[in-house]
Amino acid sequence: MSQQHDEAVKKCRGRPKTFDRDAALDKALTLFWTHGYEGTSLSDLVAATGAKAPTLYAEFENKEGLFRAAMERYIERFSAERNAALQDESKSVAEAIEGWFRATAACFTNCDTPAGCFFICTSTALSSSSSEIAHMLRQQHDAQQQTLLDFLTARQQRGDIPAQVDILSLARYLACMLQGMSVRAREGAPKADLDNIIDTLMAMWPALTGQCMKQR
């Protein structure tokens, strides 16, 4: 009986641990979000994920590959949830925009995640050696603005926004609002402060859409 027990223990000890990719990505995402790409070392990632360096390399190739996967994880978990507010065609343009910004404020100030926008937070303090990472982040900044532009374009084509409104300028303005909210959240502003910014934006909305006119 004792011999069988010893053999079972040996087999259990020799069995390799299963690598939990999703759990590792969530931990890597938090590290990159908090410290940035260059502020996060491979040893930090190994310690946080509990995986050995060879395991991480086998799964993601290198640190850049892990960052790319973490970025996709962020899009999957947070960006898609926020963008859903723009897809409800039963809402007016103002209601959809407000819903998008409210969801954004909730994401930026969620106590379970680092403050601010992952893309904006990780794009600061990048050196020239991280040009590929910088390029990926610029693409994501552009994608956020494009999401707003696509929404405004569709609503303008539907007749919900006057044809003379310059929706590109409006999308750029809203994207800048997003970046400002991220910075404020990163500085420690509570959700109430971001909600106040959104209140001001929505109070200005009628005038804002009237001012963003196409130049003849």
Regions found by a protein language model. Name each.
Residues 2, 23, 27, 31-65, ...:
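Helix-turn-helix
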Residues 76-79, 91, 95-99, 131-157, ...:
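Amphipathic alpha-helical packing segments from all-alpha helical-bundle domains
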Residues 16-18, 29, 33-35, 43-48, ...:
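Recognition helices and adjacent regulatory flanks at domain boundaries
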Residues 69, 83-115, 167, 171-174, ...:
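Hydrophobic alpha-helical connector segments
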Residues 107-110, 150, 154, 174-191, ...:
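Amphipathic C-terminal alpha-helical segment
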Residues 95-97, 110-135:
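Amphipathic alpha-helical segments used for helix-helix packing
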Residues 1-19, 211-216:
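N-terminal intrinsically disordered/low-complexity leader segments
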Residues 115, 120, 163-184, 197-204:
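Hydrophobic alpha-helical segments that form the core
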